[in-house]
Structure formats: structure tokens, C-alpha cells
Curated annotation (Swiss-Prot):
Domain (Macro) ranges: 68-260
Known cofactor(s): Zn(2+)
Protein task: ADP-ribosylhydrolase that hydrolyzes ADP-ribosyl-glutamate bonds. In vitro, it can remove the ADP-ribosyl modification from the human mono-ADP-ribosylated PARP1 E988Q mutant, which is primarily modified on glutamate site with only minor aspartate contribution. It cannot hydrolyze the ADP-ribosyl-aspartate bond of ribosylated S.pyogenes GcvH-L.
Family that this chain belongs to: Belongs to the MacroD-type family. Zn-Macro subfamily.
Pfam families: Macro (PF01661)
Catalytic activity of the protein: 5-O-(ADP-D-ribosyl)-L-glutamyl-[protein] + H2O = L-glutamyl-[protein] + ADP-D-ribose + H(+)
Domain of life where this protein originates: Archaea
Protein's name according to its UniProt entry: Protein-ADP-ribose hydrolase
Annotated source species: Methanobrevibacter oralis
Subunit note: Monomer.
Length: 260
């Protein structure tokens, strides 16, 4: 199968699962968005080996065609701490951190632009399946501040570390408990990465999206917690990357880390 044939196979498989028949769009980009939407909406359940094989070929080819960044390519650093602006799904670190929700199953909203959706969409349906197995095994939702590690599947990283950050109601102040919970997120991820003897981990901006944690406050907590961890622990980690997407977050982290 060529790229277009694989795309149509994946779409038709997921539509058949839903017992739906729709007019498939004509252009590749529209069909690609449809596939992502169907993947986003799919609840964890058994899926054929043929689907997974074709999905993996399709997604791994997409990943290979992206402008990937290795940890060694990141120039803005201070000791073990690094700052990078870009799409976390293009970063070849040992692990990337996903700001998850308590169900740990990814975002089910089609084409939503949250980090949880973006990571699951690029990784493939196996990521949701693995997360579901962990949630079923523990018998309930994931607590705020804890961390779980999974394979990264079709991402350039080796692992994804999932953590649930604190959520702030709009208009409410950040409490001392919220601060402790966010600190715990970073510590849990760093402890887990060290347990797995990883060399590098890339953090997204935990809780600052739909969870409404103020960006500057969150950055201050993130940087302080990482520095405290490095000062207090023996760790395999040599590269801890703060990955930001927006210019505003980049400016905040750059000023806090480097003073300019």
C-alpha cells in the first residue's frame, strides 16, 4: 500500500467499527484530519494486528518526515537544564512528559489542540490501550501529582511519562495545596525517569493549558523543583528539557533560567 491507500484503509477500518458510512473527503489533508478525529474518539478495545501494522507504518513514516530535534541539538542550556521551543512530538528525548487527565486515556475531543491529544495522535492507538491497562489494573483514576510511564510507540522518544497536574478554577487563586501538587508532578516524573535510568526527559508546561495554572507561577515552580531535585538526588538524568510551545512561555522560562 502507498501512503494514500494506507490512510483510506485506516479510515475505513475505524468507520466500520463505528458502523458509520460517510463520504470520505477528497484531499489528503482532509482525510488525515478525519483519521486523527476517528482515533481521538475511539475508546480502548481490541483492534486487529493488521490495523496496528498499517497504522505504525503510516505514523512512523510521518514521524521520520518531520523536522526532528535531538537533545544534543538544543543549545540553550545551563548545566543539566535546557530550554527548547517546539513540538514535543518531534523531540528525540528518552522520555517526554504528557500533561494527562485523571482517566489517563488521552483526549477524546476530535482534533483538540491540547498536549494530551497531540501526543496520543502521533503515538498511535496502542498508547491509549496501554494507559487503559494501567488504569484497569489500579482500579480507578490517576491521582494528581503521580506519574506513569508507557512506551512511546510511533514517537521519536522512547517513553511517555504521564502526570496529572492540578486544575485551577477560573478566577480562583492558586492555593498552597495547588503548588504542592504541581511540585509533586515534577518530582514524580523525575523519580520515575531516574528509576528507569533515563538520560533525558522533556517537560511540557504542566497544568497551564485547560487546567488554568498561571504560566509564570507554574514556570517558577517547575524550575525550582527541578533544581531542588538535582541538588538533592543522584540521578541518571543529564538533560532535563523545558519544552515550550508559545512565545510567551519561552520568554518566561528564558528570563527565569538565564535572566534575559
Amino acid at each position: 500500500m502507498n501512503n494514500d491507500e494506507q490512510l483510506e484503509f485506516l479510515i475505513n477500518y475505524l468507520l466500520d467499527e463505528r458502523s458509520e458510512s460517510i463520504d470520505i473527503p477528497k484531499t489528503f489533508s482532509e482525510k488525515r484530519n478525519l483519521l486523527r478525529s476517528l482515533m481521538n474518539m475511539r475508546h480502548p478495545s481490541n483492534i486487529s494486528e493488521e490495523f496496528l501494522r498499517i497504522q505504525d507504518e503510516f505514523l512512523s513514516r510521518e514521524t521520520a518526515n518531520k523536522n526532528l530535534t535531538s537533545v544534543e541539538d538544543i543549545s540553550l542550556s545551563s548545566g543539566k537544564i535546557m530550554l527548547w521551543q517546539g513540538d514535543i512530538t518531534t523531540l528525540s528525548a528518552d522520555a517526554i512528559v504528557n500533561a494527562a487527565n485523571s482517566k489517563l486515556l488521552g483526549c477524546f475531543i476530535p482534533m483538540h489542540n491540547c498536549i494530551d491529544n497531540i501526543i496520543h495522535s502521533a503515538s498511535g492507538l496502542q498508547l491509549r490501550e496501554e494507559c487503559n491497562r494501567m488504569i484497569m489494573l489500579q482500579g480507578g483514576d490517576e491521582d494528581v501529582g503521580k506519574a506513569k510511564i508507557t512506551n512511546a510507540y510511533n514517537l521519536p522518544s522512547k517513553y511517555v511519562v504521564h502526570t496529572v497536574g492540578p486544575s485551577i478554577e477560573r478566577g480562583m487563586r492558586v492555593s498552597s495545596d495547588d503548588v504542592k501538587k504541581l511540585e509533586r508532578c515534577y518530582n514524580s516524573c523525575l523519580e520515575l525517569a531516574s528509576e528507569y535510568k533515563l538520560n533525558s526527559i522533556a517537560f511540557c508546561c504542566i497544568s497551564t493549558g485547560v487546567f488554568n495554572f498561571p504560566q509564570k507561577k507554574a514556570a517558577e515552580i517547575a524550575i525550582r523543583t527541578v533544581k531542588d531535585f538535582l541538588n538533592s538526588n543522584e540521578t541518571s538524568l543529564n538533560h532535563i528539557i523545558f519544552d515550550v510551545f508559545t512565545d510567551k512561555d519561552y520568554d518566561i522560562y528564558k528570563k527565569l533560567l538565564f535572566g534575559n
